[in-house]
Amino acid sequence: MKHAIHHIHFVGIGGAGMSGIAEVLHNLGYAISGSDLSDSATLRRLAGLGIATHVGHAAAHIEGADAVVTSTAVQSDNPEVLAARERKIPVVPRALMLAELMRFKQGIAIAGAHGKTTTTSLVTSVLAEAGLDPTFVIGGKLNSAGANAKLGQGDYIVVEADESDASFLNLLPVMAVVTNIDADHMETYGHDFGRLKGAFVDFLHRMPFYGRAIVCVDSPAVREILPQVARPVTTYGFAEDAQVRALNVRAEAGSMHFTVRRSNGQSYPDLDVVLSLPGEHNVLNALSAVAVAMELEISDDALLRAFESFKGVGRRFQRYGELAAADGGSFTVIDDYGHHPVEMAATLAAARGAFPGRRLVLAFQPHRYSRTRDCFEDFVKVIGLADAVLLTEVYAAGEAPVVAADGRSLARALRVAGRVEPVFVENVAELPAAIAVNARDGDVLLCMGAGSIGAVPGKLVEMLQKQELQAQQGAAQ
């Protein structure tokens, strides 16, 4: 049946998931437009591709659109959404549009509380190295591709599946990975962990009867749902009973070296892997890609090449290099999206392994008052693992403030715990200057959070380079 959809408008096009879908549809030949509340590098990149972008929301922006796609961050009273409904233009949630894209290819969906973006990127890289030319939509920039989405010519599409709003239940993959299940985004599930686990079972049952579930049995909640999963399953992890298992794990110069043992009914040789990512959590992410490769009969050589040449993902342990410290030496800057205590603990451990013996400075912007409230004690414990801490006010992400779940309360709790004396920087715009004052020679600075702190490393680099240039000019006079 010939449809009449030619022009698709995205409300909130600056988000990682939205921009990726928009780019793939643009490359499929659709006329794409979009708007976002603020300007960003993403908007500018999309404009460079020929996509009409707007800063701010207005009813006029949807002129000529045959469908309007919305992100979960967009409210129902958004002027573009209201105008679309008034004109009887279909308003489509992001996940439904992603599901439409997946209908035309063999879908591989990556779900889980933590590690989705890196795992999706690793799986994509393995398929690309094997010559399968996948389409992908990722929640972060795949550095080797310079983008978070690409329209491939192959049979597969690799996507992140978002459980935060239960929208992953719209997808119909033929293969699904579950990296872990954790108590995050609990408001979506009525603060009922059983409902959250049930949603993951339902997600796996969105696959056809022949679909393959690839799950990490190191996650207790994943292990708990296994008896309910009525699909073929491959397990992975460090656990002795995992069918794809990592042994002899060691960190070397920012990479992970380990042996993969595979035992899912067929005879496979052990694989000695070099993964160009730090941290044991990334070893687990890589194991899921091994399981996908086994299912698709990808050669071990392609798998090993993909892991060793992996160039990482934007804002996932992203290195900004060495910057001049105030005491005359230099410090290393790393940017990371981690914003849940479990993610932060894994990233801090990875930093310890990659930079043994060095002082670890954590600059952290909490994300959402509800998460800060629900995970307050865990935040205190994990933040205290750093040697020095700079803490900002909570990035609200549209939420109203919650009493005793703000940045100052977290700073006070850290002081009471006595493990670290935090420097509280209320305005994130002042964080680069505070970092410059506190960073010493040999430090490793980790900027972490899912909010506006993502712009801090770039601004810090710009500020210190400007200061260095001014100093050189002053010395020359």
UniProtKB/Swiss-Prot annotation:
<dbReference type="InterPro" id="IPR036565">
    <property type="entry name" value="Mur-like_cat_sf"/>
</dbReference>
<dbReference type="InterPro" id="IPR036615">
    <property type="entry name" value="Mur_ligase_C_dom_sf"/>
</dbReference>
<keyword id="KW-0131">Cell cycle</keyword>
<dbReference type="GO" id="GO:0071555">
    <property type="term" value="P:cell wall organization"/>
</dbReference>
<protein>
    <recommendedName>
        <fullName>UDP-N-acetylmuramate--L-alanine ligase</fullName>
        <ecNumber>6.3.2.8</ecNumber>
    </recommendedName>
</protein>
<dbReference type="InterPro" id="IPR000713">
    <property type="entry name" value="Mur_ligase_N"/>
</dbReference>
<comment type="pathway">
    <text>Cell wall biogenesis; peptidoglycan biosynthesis.</text>
</comment>
<dbReference type="GO" id="GO:0005737">
    <property type="term" value="C:cytoplasm"/>
</dbReference>
<keyword id="KW-0961">Cell wall biogenesis/degradation</keyword>
<dbReference type="GO" id="GO:0009252">
    <property type="term" value="P:peptidoglycan biosynthetic process"/>
</dbReference>
<dbReference type="Pfam" id="PF08245">
    <property type="entry name" value="Mur_ligase_M"/>
</dbReference>
<keyword id="KW-0547">Nucleotide-binding</keyword>
<keyword id="KW-0963">Cytoplasm</keyword>
<dbReference type="Pfam" id="PF02875">
    <property type="entry name" value="Mur_ligase_C"/>
</dbReference>
<comment type="similarity">
    <text>Belongs to the MurCDEF family.</text>
</comment>
<dbReference type="GO" id="GO:0005524">
    <property type="term" value="F:ATP binding"/>
</dbReference>
<dbReference type="InterPro" id="IPR013221">
    <property type="entry name" value="Mur_ligase_cen"/>
</dbReference>
<feature type="binding site">
    <location>
        <begin position="112"/>
        <end position="118"/>
    </location>
    <ligand>
        <name>ATP</name>
    </ligand>
</feature>
<keyword id="KW-0132">Cell division</keyword>
<dbReference type="Pfam" id="PF01225">
    <property type="entry name" value="Mur_ligase"/>
</dbReference>
<dbReference type="InterPro" id="IPR004101">
    <property type="entry name" value="Mur_ligase_C"/>
</dbReference>
<comment type="function">
    <text>Cell wall formation.</text>
</comment>
<keyword id="KW-0067">ATP-binding</keyword>
<dbReference type="GO" id="GO:0051301">
    <property type="term" value="P:cell division"/>
</dbReference>
<dbReference type="InterPro" id="IPR050061">
    <property type="entry name" value="MurCDEF_pg_biosynth"/>
</dbReference>
<keyword id="KW-0573">Peptidoglycan synthesis</keyword>
<dbReference type="GO" id="GO:0008360">
    <property type="term" value="P:regulation of cell shape"/>
</dbReference>
<dbReference type="GO" id="GO:0008763">
    <property type="term" value="F:UDP-N-acetylmuramate-L-alanine ligase activity"/>
</dbReference>
<keyword id="KW-0436">Ligase</keyword>
<keyword id="KW-0133">Cell shape</keyword>
<dbReference type="InterPro" id="IPR005758">
    <property type="entry name" value="UDP-N-AcMur_Ala_ligase_MurC"/>
</dbReference>
